[in-house]
Amino acid sequence: MMLRKLVLAVVLLTSAFVQNAALSSSVSPSVREPGTDSALAHPLAQETSREMCTERRHPCLRDSLAMQAGMPPSTTQAGMPAFPHPGFDSNYKLSLPSPVQDKNFYLLSLFQRNPVVRRLLSQRRTLQQLAATKAAALKRAPGCNDVRCFDQLIRLDGPTIEAVATELQALANRPEFKLLAKRELRPSGVFITYNNQSDAQMLVAAWKDAAKGMNRILSVYGLGEAPRYKDIDRVSYDLSSEAYRIILKVKTAEIKFAKAPLFFEPTLNFALMLLEINRRDEAGRFEPLEQGENKAAVQNLTEIKWNDYPYSFILVLGSGGLDLTTSISPIGAKRTDVAAQLFLQHKAPLIIVSGGYVHPMQTPYCEAIEMKKYLMAKYKIPEAGILVEPQARHTTTNFRNAARLAFRYGIPTERTALVTSSEDHIASSTRDEFRTRNISELGYFPIEYIKRISLVAAEFKPSVASLFFDANDPLDP
């Protein structure tokens, strides 16, 4: 009997591995041109009752073996099996007690919060010297009379970044850092871009991303260099003004850090201070979502019978207000109307409203929050049916951030989702140029495929690559 069970387990493992390898080699993300479908009144040729064991990530494998051993299958927040994804563990819970820092610099937060890792870092002579140098520089910074002086004292130059990389390369082979990679770096999905690299390579790549991210904040919000989208993301002050120099002096003098700071903490704290004085905390607003705006919807996920719906969720792409007094624009309202109609037609059990504090710059209104209010007030859609994604600032990140919610909350990502927006927006989002834009701005395509099915809607599948945190975009990393 034991031999039969062992043979069965080996057969299951081998079969799943072969199936996954074959599918992985034959399936690639694509942007498809609009088809001939003109309405949403039909099932859209999307089979919704497929057995999940036939999907590309062989999701039933782990639980079938678990049940043979007399153990219950693991589940996600949505009540679905906790399927394994390459480079991501759906049971991993992100720790975001300081969300602006944590989402921009998750690696550095892990360094700070792990006492064993922190001690090992603080014992390296090269890193000790760097910490002392930057701490002394930060203490001198209030004496600066222009923004370039601050920058020269605090910025991490190329040789310094490489010197730290060398130290981390050496530390990566220690069991404490291997454990950090096993328990945090890899299962978090935050560094999924480097999933195929060794632990040491992932650690070094993540450090270089963090260093470039800190320097990027210094460039944009310290020196006033133009961000990619300058109309909405730029610095909030006239950097040549006496008022700004006074603010910098005062706030820099207030920066606190440990008596024996880690090598990155002086630069990190200065960068975070720049975001603070420019009122650029968008990345952390409403976090943790699952305990606030998304609490009701997340708690309801286990009640959803996913096979009763042709789509897993409906994504609504936000549209900013016309001025600082407009809570939701006519375009935004129209897009939300379409989503409500699809929801009431039972196309999906959830609506994800996506959009942050975007247009105009420093608007007091969050697109996603206003769309949620609109859905609840006009259509009486229950809060449990609406997930809020309140940070996206562009179409690229609308898709990326919605994918993150789906993977983090355990929404079945092997199923197709629906996106709705205005006609021209859907048209542009389903062209090949949209893939090019994503790769240029994000470094990857956050969608496995997208296909236009009507003038105002397209179906798509989210990509697990979306979990990667991007420190180059501090307002929505």
Residue ranges and their predicted role:
Residues 1-7:
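Bacterial N-terminal signal peptides that target proteins for export
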Residues 9-16:
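Bacterial N-terminal signal peptides
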Residues 16, 38, 77-78:
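Serine/threonine-rich, low-complexity intrinsically disordered segments
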Residues 19-41:
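Signal peptide processing junction and immediate N-terminal pro/mature segment
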Residues 43, 48, 53-65, 70, ...:
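A structural signal for short, hydrophobic/glycine-enriched beta-strand patches
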